């Protein structure tokens, strides 16, 4: 890693120096400490210390497309510049979350676009900002999904992603997604989570308390009993062709950055990392801004 990586992370010497044990360090020593220890320790190092700080980076004056807002849109849904997209209609979403006490049904947003087959050609608008919170991990084919988002992004537009860090959420025990997983999904042209993805999602989860995960209290899973309990039901459901939602990918900031960089080098996407904000202590998400570039750029 180099100074350019510090710029990618939006590193601030002044912010990082506020820690008592770092106050007397030089700029060079701060940079070394951040790269060696600070990222792993989840220290605050810049202007983004939480979700609100990240959202506040967004210029909301232009057209905005929010992916999967469910019942918690991050922007004014009444604005004429606001659009949303989901793989389910509002009615389907209400039905899907009927027994979930954490979802306020009356607040579920009516999607401007309902697209479950990766065909974004129906979208004629071009957006200055695309915002997606905890959706990228659901996308059956990361390459196709990123290209779809790029296809409706204005030339100087930006894609803002809030992504769960698999180390600190209920995905802790699942294998980290690598570039080979991503390329295989692209080769298979997956348009919905595979049966295996759904089974793993339901049977390999643990608790979702980020503080406990940061303290290395990861809980345990009982995959066998859950698998036996759900297998037949899921198989019957999957055979009907219905879209069964699941986490398909499991990222860390480092793995996601490497995947995006490799996909761009392979000329499979025309997006690059503009900024990346590492997971901070007590949180289970990191933030990424993607920008559009020429495929040979």
Please give the residue ranges for each predicted region.
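Structural motif
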Residues: 56-59, 122, 268
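Conserved SAM-binding loop
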Residues: 62-172, 288-294
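Class I SAM-dependent methyltransferase Rossmann-like catalytic core
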Residues: 47-59
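Short, charged/polar micro-motifs that form catalytic or ligand-binding hotspots
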Residues: 24, 129-140, 246-250, 277
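Charge-rich, low-complexity intrinsically disordered regions
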Residues: 1-50
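S-adenosyl-L-methionine-dependent methyltransferase catalytic module, highlighting the catalytic core
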Residues: 103-120, 144, 148, 158-294
């Amino acid at each position: 890693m180099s100074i350019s990586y510090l710029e990618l992370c939006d590193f601030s010497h002044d912010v990082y120096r506020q820690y008592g044990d770092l106050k007397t360090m030089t700029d060079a020593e701060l940079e070394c400490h951040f790269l060696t220890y600070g990222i792993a320790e989840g220290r605050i190092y810049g202007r983004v210390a939480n979700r609100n700080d990240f959202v506040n980076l967004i210029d909301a004056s232009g057209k905005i497309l929010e992916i999967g807002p469910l019942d918690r849109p991050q922007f004014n849904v009444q604005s004429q510049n606001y659009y949303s997209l989901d793989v389910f209609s509002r009615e389907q979403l209400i039905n899907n979350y009927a027994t979930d006490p954490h979802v306020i049904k009356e607040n579920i947003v009516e999607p401007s676009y309902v697209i479950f087959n990766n065909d974004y050609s129906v979208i004629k608008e071009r957006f200055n900002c695309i915002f997606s919170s905890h959706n990228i991990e659901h996308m059956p084919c990361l390459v196709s999904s990123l290209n779809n988002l790029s296809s409706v992004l204005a030339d100087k537009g930006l894609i803002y992603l809030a992504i769960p860090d698999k180390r600190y959420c209920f995905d802790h025990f699942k294998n980290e997604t690598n570039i080979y997983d991503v390329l295989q999904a692209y080769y298979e042209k997956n348009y919905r989570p595979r049966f295996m993805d759904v089974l793993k999602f339901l049977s390999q989860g643990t608790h979702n308390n980020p503080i406990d995960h940061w303290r290395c209290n990861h809980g345990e899973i009982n995959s066998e009993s859950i698998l036996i309990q759900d297998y037949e039901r899921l198989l019957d459901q999957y055979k009907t062709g219905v879209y069964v939602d699941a986490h398909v990918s499991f990222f860390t900031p480092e793995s996601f950055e490497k995947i995006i960089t490799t996909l761009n080098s392979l000329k499979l996407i025309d997006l690059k990392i503009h900024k990346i904000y590492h997971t901070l202590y007590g949180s289970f998400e990191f933030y990424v801004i993607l920008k559009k570039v020429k495929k040979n750029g």
